[in-house]
């Protein structure tokens, strides 16, 4: 709907924004009026055929990986993002932690149902079309890039445990404490043992060639 595109445009970047859903595209176009540096397209992350190879300095894949379930679709989305990025360019892939999904949703609903939906009896992570969102083990997501022409820079937590905590009726923080939490979170956002507790994560890499 333009949140990221407008923020980047305000920082002086030229932005090509791709939206799958027509109604969301209309909102994006409406919200980005007056920003000549934003070009909005309707498209699919698994087929960015409207863009030539090596078109962009940076590519953000924010959202599609939450809703792609088959290995074929997942790999197409990754390959397309890499294809349209210039050699040496940066790529940012947002994804969800399956464990944080359990903590932030299952504890407030039916743990048994969520567990059956997200894990096999052997506790392997499941991905299937009927899931509204699909989550990953961090190492599982990182392995998707093993054979890709990219250099892994880092994997970082975006929101930490806040999504789970904000649902508690007794949870509140002062503005001063929230500012302190942000600084603290940024200091530890790449710490491996904390990654799985964050709902949203970023896989950050550089295209090699």
Task: Annotate each PLM feature.
Residues 1-48:
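Class I SAM-dependent methyltransferase SAM/SAH-binding core
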Residues 46-59:
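A short acidic, Gly/Pro-enriched loop at the edge of an enzyme's catalytic core
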Residues 57-72:
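A short SAM/SAH-binding and catalytic strip from SAM-dependent methyltransferases
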Residues 75-90:
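A short glycine-rich, Lys/Arg-flanked "PGG" loop and its adjoining helix->strand segment in the class I
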Residues 90-119:
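Conserved class I S-adenosyl-L-methionine
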Residues 112-133:
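C-terminal alpha-helical "lid/dimerization" subdomain adjacent to the S-adenosyl-L-methionine
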Residues 130-149, 153-155:
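Short alpha-helix
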Residues 154-209:
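A C-terminal cap/extension of S-adenosyl-L-methionine-dependent methyltransferases
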């Amino acid at each position: 709907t333009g949140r990221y595109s407008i923020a980047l445009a305000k920082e002086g970047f030229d932005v090509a924004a791709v939206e799958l859903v027509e109604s969301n595209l209309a909102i994006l176009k409406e919200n980005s009026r007056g920003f000549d540096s934003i070009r909005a397209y309707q498209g699919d992350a698994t087929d960015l055929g409207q863009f030539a190879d090596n078109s962009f300095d940076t590519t953000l894949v924010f959202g599609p990986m939450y809703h792609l379930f088959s290995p074929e679709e997942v790999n197409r989305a990754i390959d397309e993002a890499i294809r349209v990025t210039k050699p040496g360019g940066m790529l940012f892939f947002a994804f969800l932690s399956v464990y944080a999904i359990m903590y932030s949703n299952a504890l407030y609903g039916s743990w048994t149902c969520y567990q059956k939906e997200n894990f096999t009896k052997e506790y392997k992570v499941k991905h299937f079309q009927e899931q509204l969102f699909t989550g990953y083990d961090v190492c599982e997501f990182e392995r998707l890039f093993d054979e890709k022409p990219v250099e892994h820079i880092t994997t970082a937590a975006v929101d930490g445990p806040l999504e789970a905590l904000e649902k508690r009726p007794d949870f509140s923080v002062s503005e001063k404490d929230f500012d302190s939490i942000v600084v603290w979170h940024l200091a530890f956002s790449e710490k491996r043992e904390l990654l799985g507790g964050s709902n949203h994560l970023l896989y950050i890499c550089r295209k090699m060639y």
